Design a protein with these regions (language model features):
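Short loop/turn segments that flank or connect secondary-structure elements
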Residues: 58-163, 172-185
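N-terminal cysteine/histidine-rich coordination modules
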Residues: 1-56, 61
Length: 185
């Protein structure tokens, strides 16, 4: 969006984790406020109208009607953890939150590089986005403790990773599917 730039592009103005988005990872989007390739966004326009606040929760009018229904459906990333992620970033401090976000991004890149059979990108993105960091660390440790996977075909490696991630999600009753927005009308 013209005139909208931010120094922190990994964690968006509205609280979404751009660092874990497939569009950002693939180089198709620079992240929130990252310059060329950024999509038009009503929330970014609102930020400009309110003095360019770095994050919406720093605006005195937050939460505002712009967020009505915002978390009801997903885009390239799940929206359902957005408010929880904002709370965590404010509680831990942005620097600590961003360090954890970078660790999640590294885990996601590892899954995509070593366990993606060409059909699991959305699943891995969603799982890393929604699962707590400690669960992701456990899954990666379990995968790393299975050297026989290195000798197996991509499909078998992918299935092993999917199984462990799904088990972690099931233990927490987390659905690893993106939610579609209900159609208006």
């Amino acid at each position: 969006m013209k005139g909208f730039t931010r120094t922190e592009t990994r964690f968006s103005l509205c609280g979404l984790n751009c660092a874990l988005c497939s569009m950002h990872l693939g180089g198709y989007c620079p992240g929130c406020g990252g310059g060329a390739g950024n999509q038009s966004c009503a929330i970014a326009k609102c930020s400009l109208e309110h003095g360019g606040v770095p994050f919406c929760w720093e605006c005195p009018e937050y939460p505002c009607p712009r967020y009505d229904g915002f978390d009801d459906g997903d885009s390239f990333v799940p929206h359902r953890n957005r408010q929880q992620d904002i709370a965590q970033a404010t509680e831990l401090g942005l620097d600590v939150y961003l360090m954890q976000l970078e660790e999640k991004r590294n885990i996601l890149e590892g899954l995509l590089a070593h366990y993606n059979d060409g059909h699991r990108k959305t699943f891995f993105n969603t799982a890393v986005y929604l699962l707590p960091l400690e669960d992701l660390r456990s899954v990666m440790a379990a995968l790393n403790n299975r050297p026989e996977l290195d000798e197996q075909a991509g499909k078998e490696r992918a299935l092993a990773a999917v199984e462990l991630l799904q088990e972690a999600a099931d233990r927490r009753s987390i659905s690893l599917k993106l939610n579609k927005k209900a159609k208006k009308g």
